[in-house]
């Protein structure tokens, strides 16, 4: 299984843009996550999302997108996909770990939210295993999860 040391996040540039657009989940997973083309267009339009290519060694294996709303102390992981050829190797977990660490480094980020299509049991298991808990909310048919980084209390 991959670890955060095996995986790096890189900016989407003209050098990897086309390859990123060609990443795809399995056919039975297509309803679980927006296409990378849509996600990149959304990032360009909203001006706050941070899209990243997930690399393992020299291979582009997936895509993750997040943003940090410092004014409300929240981070959001809005997309995570690993190409069908590279699934089951721990790359999604490693990429999530890297994004969580980036958000922890932002003092204003106290909690992280994400969501998943309920039928995507693998995503639900992944997020729970990383410490995310269901909020009880449903957003556009997706189960909302939250990871508390800092609850405002101080340890003695």
PLM regions and their residue ranges:
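Acetyl-CoA-dependent GNAT
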Residues: 6-78, 83-85, 96, 102, ...
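Conserved beta-strand-loop-alpha-helix junction that forms the acyl-donor binding cleft
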Residues: 113-124, 140-142, 150
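Conserved active-site alpha-helix within GNAT-family acetyltransferase domains
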Residues: 93, 118-136
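Terminal substrate-recognition subdomain of acyl/acetyltransferases
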Residues: 2, 143-156
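Conserved GNAT acetyl-CoA-binding A-motif
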Residues: 103-115
């Amino acid at each position: 299984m991959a670890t955060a040391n095996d995986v790096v996040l890189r900016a989407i540039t003209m050098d990897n843009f086309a390859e990123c657009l060609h990443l795809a989940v399995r056919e039975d997973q297509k309803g679980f996550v927006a296409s990378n083309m849509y996600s990149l267009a959304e990032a360009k339009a909203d001006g706050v999302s941070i899209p990243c290519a997930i690399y393992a060694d020299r291979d582009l294996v997936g895509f993750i997108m997040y943003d940090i709303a410092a004014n409300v102390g929240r981070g959001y992981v809005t997309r995570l996909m690993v190409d069908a050829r590279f699934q089951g190797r721990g790359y999604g977990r490693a990429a999530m770990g890297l994004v969580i660490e980036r958000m922890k480094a932002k003092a204003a980020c106290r909690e992280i939210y994400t969501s998943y299509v309920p039928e995507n049991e693998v995503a639900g298991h992944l997020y729970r295993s990383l410490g995310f808990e269901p909020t009880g909310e449903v957003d556009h048919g997706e189960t909302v999860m939250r990871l508390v980084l800092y609850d405002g209390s101080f340890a003695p």
